Structure formats: C-alpha cells, structure tokens
Amino acid sequence: MKANNAEAPDSSNAADTLKWVATFVLLVAAVVGNYLYGELSVVARAAGVIVLIAAALGVAATTTKGKEAIVFARESRMEVRKVVWPTRQETMQTTLIVLAVSIVMALALWGIDGIMVRLVAFATGV
C-alpha cells in the first residue's frame, strides 16, 4: 500500500513538472511572438499575448502549486470581506491628524535647521 502512495506523488510530480515547462514555453512564446511579429498591429499582438498568458495561467492553475494558489486567493478574498473598514468620517479625521502632525514636524525641523545654521555661522565667524 505504501508503494502505491509513493508512486502517486512521482507521477503527479512529473505531470506538474511538464505543466510548468508548458507554462514557461507559453510565456516565452508570448514574448518572442510579440518581438517577431512587430510589424503587426498593436491590437493583434496584444491579443496574442493575452491569449498566451491566459493559456499559461490556465495550465499553471492545474498544477498542485497552482491549485494551492487559487485556494489561497479565495481564502484571502474571504478575509478581506471580514475586515471592518473605517467610515468616511474616521478616514477624514485620521487624514487631518496626519496632515497636522506633518505640518508641526515640518515647522519644528525648519526651526531647528534655522537655529543650527545660525550656530554654525556664529562658530565659524561667517
């Protein structure tokens, strides 16, 4: 029974490797095709690149890692829905606080800079 379980990952691994090679070949074909068919219209080349990238994503999605990535994306989307987003009022208040603190810090640094310039001028006799 363990021998059967050991064979399944190897065949799956080989299939995944073949799928990743196919994905890479499709992406290289998109880049090379875009370069070689430079005389065609931009729309035709863009359509070709989009089709090849979509095909590459489709092939990659059938691999083990691709399926894991799809599950991760779905779970991430569900987590984003659970986030409690701030109201417009909270957003505006926070933005104004950040703006006020930035202005105060800018004025403080400007003042410190002015004092330092005068101290250096006094020390050097300029």
Swiss-Prot record:
Pfam families: SecE (PF00584). GO terms for molecular function: protein transmembrane transporter activity. GO terms for biological process: intracellular protein transmembrane transport; protein secretion; protein targeting; protein transport by the Sec complex. The chain crosses the membrane at residues 18-38, 40-60, 97-117. One of its GO terms (cellular component) is plasma membrane. It is a multi-pass membrane protein. The keyword Iron does not apply. It is found in: Cell inner membrane. Its main location: membrane. Keywords: Cell inner membrane, Cell membrane, Membrane, Protein transport, Translocation, Transmembrane, Transmembrane helix, Transport. PROSITE patterns: SECE_SEC61G. It comes from the Bacteria. The keyword Transmembrane helix applies. InterPro entries: SecE_bac (IPR005807), SecE_sf (IPR038379), Translocase_SecE/Sec61-g (IPR001901). Belongs to the SecE/SEC61-gamma family. Essential subunit of the Sec protein translocation channel SecYEG. Clamps together the 2 halves of SecY. May contact the channel plug during translocation. PANTHER family: PROTEIN TRANSLOCASE SUBUNIT SECE (PTHR33910:SF1). Component of the Sec protein translocase complex. Heterotrimer consisting of SecY, SecE and SecG subunits. The heterotrimers can form oligomers, although 1 heterotrimer is thought to be able to translocate proteins. Interacts with the ribosome. Interacts with SecDF, and other proteins may be involved. Interacts with SecA. This is Protein translocase subunit SecE. It comes from Vibrio cholerae serotype O1 (strain ATCC 39315 / El Tor Inaba N16961). The lineage of its organism: Bacteria, Pseudomonadati, Pseudomonadota, Gammaproteobacteria, Vibrionales. The gene is secE.
